[in-house]
């Protein structure tokens, strides 16, 4: 069986972006899940930052995973992947220079595309966890990412959160990233089609949409007409794996089946309340 090179996988992803269809990603988190996704016919996969944190650290999504840890997991996937994989590279693990290092390492790992977001990460002392960096810094990160890539087929996608700012600010940011040379725009927090249309009409590069299964956005044909080429519904496969592991081990110990959901199990074993308490204790301004 022919195993596509990393460049060929990147070209395959570019072809998806150049098409007139809308594709749904498979959540891939290790080599086995990547092989399964390809065998089932998924056109592309995504290694989510939150999922990588769970898989590598058993920690909640508090930007705790390091670039090296993330790249190691991406490399394991890249060794076997027969489908293009997008890396959720969070904020690029630092400033624009860190973004350049991130691109170099993920390109070497075999990733087909990566997203760089403009959220202020990791959370800063005395700042809201939902703050965004300024547009100018976001543009600098995208320009740095483009400069750092060696294979021109590697897709650089600028990501922003449409839920945290008004639509005019979203348009301003996405236009700036488009002008900076981003190959695509990733939108999180889009409410419905009216919200999406207000943003999409200003853009001429492909869109990637993180919907988390939002029922207001379940129309692939309409999404495609608006320029959406990639949809991320979430990471249900990973959480199903957690649930299956828990239920299997409980049964081996002779326990009855549990009614805990996958989401509840994730919280049970990643201790988010502890991290939140530490953040309040060490990172908030005391009155």
From Swiss-Prot:
- InterPro entries in the cross-refs: ICL/PEPM, Oxaloacetate_deCOase_bac, Pyrv/PenolPyrv_kinase-like_dom, Pyrv_kinase-like_dom_sf
How the protein is activated or inhibited is described as: Not inhibited by 3,3-difluoroxaloacetate.
Quote the catalytic activity from the record.
oxaloacetate + H(+) = pyruvate + CO2
> Cofactor binding mode, per the note?
Binds 1 Mg(2+) ion per subunit.
What span is annotated as the signal peptide, if there is one?
Answer: none
> What superkingdom does the record give?
Bacteria
Spell out the family assignment given in the record's similarity comment.
Answer: Belongs to the isocitrate lyase/PEP mutase superfamily. Oxaloacetate decarboxylase family.
**Record-given protein name:** Oxaloacetate decarboxylase
């Amino acid at each position: 069986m022919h195993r596509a090179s990393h460049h060929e996988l990147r070209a395959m992803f570019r072809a998806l972006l150049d098409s007139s269809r809308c594709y749904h990603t498979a959540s891939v988190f290790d080599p086995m899940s990547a092989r399964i996704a390809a065998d089932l016919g998924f056109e592309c996969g995504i290694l989510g930052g939150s999922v990588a944190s769970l898989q590598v650290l058993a920690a909640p999504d508090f930007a705790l995973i390091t670039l090296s840890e993330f790249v190691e997991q991406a490399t394991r996937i890249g060794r076997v992947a027969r489908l293009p994989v997008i890396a959720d590279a969070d904020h690029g693990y630092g400033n624009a220079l860190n973004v350049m290092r991130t691109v170099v390492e993920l390109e070497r790992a075999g990733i087909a595309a990566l997203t760089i977001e403009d959220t202020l990460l990791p959370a800063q002392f005395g700042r809201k966890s939902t703050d965004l960096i300024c547009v100018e810094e976001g543009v600098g990160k995208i320009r740095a990412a483009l400069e750092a890539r060696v294979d021109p087929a590697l897709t650089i996608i600028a990501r922003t959160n449409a839920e945290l700012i008004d639509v005019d600010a979203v348009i301003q940011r996405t236009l700036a990233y488009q002008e900076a040379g981003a190959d695509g725009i990733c939108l999180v927090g889009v409410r419905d089609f009216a919200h999406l249309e207000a943003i999409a009409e200003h853009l001429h590069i492909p869109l990637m949409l993180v919907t988390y299964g939002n029922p207001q956005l379940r129309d692939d044909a309409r999404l495609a007409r608006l320029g959406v080429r990639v949809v991320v519904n979430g990471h249900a496969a990973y959480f199903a794996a957690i649930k299956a592991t828990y239920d299997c081990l409980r049964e081996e110990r002779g326990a009855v089946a549990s009614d805990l959901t996958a989401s509840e199990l994730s919280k049970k074993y990643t201790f988010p309340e502890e991290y939140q308490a530490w953040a309040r204790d060490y990172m908030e301004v005391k009155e």
